[in-house]
Regions:
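Alpha-helical segment of the N-proximal tetratricopeptide repeat
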Residues: 19-61, 65-75, 102, 106, ...
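Helix-start (N-cap) detector for alpha-helical repeat units in TPR-like alpha-solenoids
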Residues: 27, 60-62, 94-95, 128-129, ...
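Canonical tetratricopeptide repeat
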Residues: 32, 65-66, 99, 133, ...
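Register position in tetratricopeptide repeats
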Residues: 39-40, 72-73, 106-107, 140-141, ...
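Conserved structural position within tetratricopeptide repeats
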Residues: 51-55, 84-88, 118-122, 152-157, ...
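Short coil turns that delineate tetratricopeptide repeat
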Residues: 57-58, 91, 125, 159-160, ...
Length: 295
């Protein structure tokens, strides 16, 4: 490099220039070694490479990659620290703000999360994801009305259905015992993904609350087919069957669930000799919304 610089400029490369070039080369080596290490699953080595690279140069792209690697290592506080540094140099980067909001949510730092979301709204109040993040925050804080309002704003700002916001709003409405409205939201997202076991479970719970046991049974049966390891589907289906006086059929469902996920259902009751008591315990344990199907 020094030879060519001398050839074309007539000047020899200074010691300072040489050191700067060496520093740049070292930075590139650490950065791309880190990227390669992360790709092949050597996370600790990757983190060390990114740390060393950032000691040599403050590079936003590398810092973002480093933050992502820290999330993979479950070091959320470390990732927050890196993204906050990026935010200092790029305060208008909406993606960084939304990623920060999610990390603050996961670490239950709701005040900081709200500040970040408000900053994002000042940049662009038409961004649905910001309202969705606020909805999650309000739900976590127990402010269901504000959470529903933010879900509604998120939904209204997107031309196509915002599945996550509909699903969250349906959950909120269920907790608020607005079962008809909750079912309407679930129906919207089931049109988008009719085999989503989470949507089907919530649809079943709506149907139970609205005294539609046959529809609820259809939902839970479909969940068992799609994902046989959703233990709650067996419990809720068994509870409905018990309420209908179909003790043998309920016992069969419970046994089926036990064979597929014995450890999860074992927590309901240590002994399985008494199916009726078992279903009482199971439904009580798995019914946080307080539905009553007559058991």
């Amino acid at each position: 490099m020094g030879f060519f610089k001398t050839l074309f400029t007539g000047k020899e490369e200074s010691e300072e220039d040489k050191q700067e070039q060496q520093k740049k080369n070292q930075f590139d080596v650490f950065k791309y070694d880190g990227i390669q290490a992360q790709r092949i699953g050597k996370l600790e080595y990757a983190l060390e490479c990114f740390r060393r690279a950032l000691e040599l140069r403050d590079d936003m792209e590398t810092r973002l990659i480093y933050a992502n690697a820290l999330v993979s290592a479950n070091d959320l506080e470390g990732a927050i620290e890196q993204l906050e540094k990026v935010r200092e140099t790029a305060p208008d980067n909406k993606e960084v703000l939304l990623n920060l909001a999610e990390l603050y949510f996961q670490t239950e730092q709701y005040e900081q999360m709200e500040d970040i979301c408000n900053a994002a709204l000042q940049l662009d109040d038409s961004e649905p994801a910001t309202h969705y993040q606020l909805a999650k925050m309000y739900k976590a804080k127990g402010d269901m009305i504000s959470a529903v309002a933010q879900c509604t704003l998120a939904i209204s700002k997107l031309d196509e259905p915002f599945a996550e916001a509909y699903y969250l709003r349906a959950q909120l409405l269920m907790e608020m015992q607005q079962y008809t409205e909750a079912e309407a939201d679930v129906d919207v997202i089931l049109q988008l993904d009719e085999e989503n076991d989470e949507y089907l479970m919530l649809k079943g719970e709506c149907c139970e609350a609205l005294q539609k046991p046959e529809e609820a049974k259809e939902c839970y049966t479909k969940v068992k087919t799609i994902n046989p390891y959703v233990t709650n589907a067996y419990l809720r289906l068994g509870a409905i069957l018990m309420a209908e006086g179909k003790k043998d059929e309920a016992a069969k469902i419970v046994e089926e669930g036990l064979q597929l996920a014995p450890e999860e259902l074992k927590n309901v009751n240590g002994e399985y000799s008494n199916v009726e008591q078992e279903m009482h315990d199971a439904y009580k344990a798995m019914d946080p919304l307080g539905f009553n199907v007559g058991i």
